[in-house]
């Protein structure tokens, strides 16, 4: 069964540019590590501290294998460090979704 991972980020609204840099880096890193990146979104109008990302996988096992590759990837690890050092992500929630058919 295919799954989509929905990630909801609570952001520091004064560091949205840093989140945009972070999200842009995933555009190449996620596919390289085996994820199907559907996109990342950031605040435009209205609520100014919520960003999101969607990635699809063939199964939960495929997501777990991808996450292991992502943590071992040099660029992936660097992007995680960037987020930790800059502290623009205040919290992160993951929801695993399945399509309605």
Tell where the protein language model's regions lie, with residue ranges.
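An amphipathic, aromatic/His-enriched active-site/gating alpha helix that lines ligand/cofactor pockets
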Residues: 21-38, 56-93
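Solvent-exposed residues in well-ordered beta-strands and their adjoining turns
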Residues: 10-12, 56-58, 97
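Short acidic/glycine-enriched loop/turn segments that link adjacent beta-strands
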Residues: 46-49
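Short, surface-exposed ligand-recognition loops at beta-strand->loop->(often short) alpha-helix junctions
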Residues: 11-21
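Short, structured motif recognition centered on aromatic/hydrophobic residues
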Residues: 3-8, 19, 30, 51-57
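Intrinsic disorder/low-complexity detector
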Residues: 1-2, 85-101
